[in-house]
Amino acid sequence: MKNITILGATGSIGTQTLDVIRKEKEELKLVAISANKSYKKVIEIIKEFKPKYAVLMEENAFKIVEDFCIDNKIDTKVLKGMEGMIYISTLEEVNTVVTSVVGMIGLVPTIKAIESGKDIALANKETLVVAGELVISKAKEHNVNILPVDSEHGAIFQCLRGNKKEEVKNIIVTASGGPFRGKKKEELIEVKPEHALKHPKWNMGRKISIDSATLMNKGLEVIEAHFLFGVDYENIKVVVHPQSIVHSMVEYKDGSVIAQMATPDMKLPIQYALNYPNRKESQIEPLDFYKISNLTFEKPDMDTFLPLKLAYEAGEKGGVMPAILNGANEVAVDLFLKGKIEFLQIGDLLQECMNKFYKSMEATLENVISVDKEVREYLGKKYDI
């Protein structure tokens, strides 16, 4: 029996993680959850799974859930804020922490979980992007597994199993291309949030949907892959694959290319991470090769989708530059969703902040938190948020 904590239990990945646990109750037990303010969903989770702990970040939501548990004589202990997140990430009985919160908020709980010897099922891209070197070194120090919970890195992880790192030539990360695949810059001037939120293949949260539309999501995955698999940026390639059947590939020096293929369904990488190193009975629709008419691959347009190009630049620059990129992107996406900037301005703001805030400093926890704060305060004042 594996005991699980889910950080971000009410979001897209968190909800699908609950689906996996629901179908594997003999092997997986939900011990603790966190959420921002979706108290109704938290109450439903408490009713069904009866976790020992629930954490709410927002004060009012915390009080509502706490009152519900008291009134209904439910034993779930309700905690709040970052202290609560860290507490449930370091519980002695927990084996694996699923980090599916969005943004920088997942960084400190993830590091604390690693220091407590927990395996990490990592769905929070930002953690590795801003502090990859620190996270990976901590994981090695404490002998814990960092298990990627996304289709691309989960695929690469599987393609590498049983092979030697020195035999790898290239990692090939596939991208659906998002809702604007094939469009040029001039065609994206009038894009509104509702257009960018319509992903052709995946059901995702709002922030990651916008990242997918700008190809920033793929840029973050390139930086993640660098840290997760120890591969240089020049050997990490992005290929647009609109069918989303091939989830990523590894090219070896003898010319062999190993690809992981499956129906596009996030429950597969979630299930694989939670049960690692074992495989369990499938919870997704099997891949039917007779129904696949063709598989196509294209080169990404980095001029139109500037954030992908900037992610490579930030990764190669290293230090705190990925943290600057990430902080600027989180704010820029929020500004776009609120109608305060245009779609193409997202890339412009990333470039502006990378130029303005770069400092030659090591990516320590203190440094990345500090530069992230600087970027957010600057954009906050600029756009009065």
Curated annotation (Swiss-Prot):
InterPro entries linked: DXP_reductoisomerase, DXP_reductoisomerase_C, DXP_reductoisomerase_N, DXPR_C, DXPR_C_sf, NAD(P)-bd_dom_sf
Enzyme's top EC category: oxidoreductase
Annotated residues for binding of NADPH: 10-13, 37, 124, 126, 205
Gene Ontology molecular functions: 1-deoxy-D-xylulose-5-phosphate reductoisomerase activity; manganese ion binding; NADPH binding
Cofactor: Mg(2+); Mn(2+)
Name recorded for this polypeptide: 1-deoxy-D-xylulose 5-phosphate reductoisomerase
GO BP of this protein: isopentenyl diphosphate biosynthetic process, methylerythritol 4-phosphate pathway involved in terpenoid biosynthetic process
Enzyme Commission designation: 1.1.1.267
Signal sequence interval, chain numbering: none
Catalytic reactions of this protein: 2-C-methyl-D-erythritol 4-phosphate + NADP(+) = 1-deoxy-D-xylulose 5-phosphate + NADPH + H(+)
Source organism per UniProt: Clostridium botulinum (strain Okra / Type B1)
The protein's role, per its UniProt record: Catalyzes the NADPH-dependent rearrangement and reduction of 1-deoxy-D-xylulose-5-phosphate (DXP) to 2-C-methyl-D-erythritol 4-phosphate (MEP).
Gene behind this protein: dxr
Family: Belongs to the DXR family.
Keyword annotations of the record: Isoprene biosynthesis, Manganese, Metal-binding, NADP, Oxidoreductase
Binding site for Mn(2+): 150, 152, 221
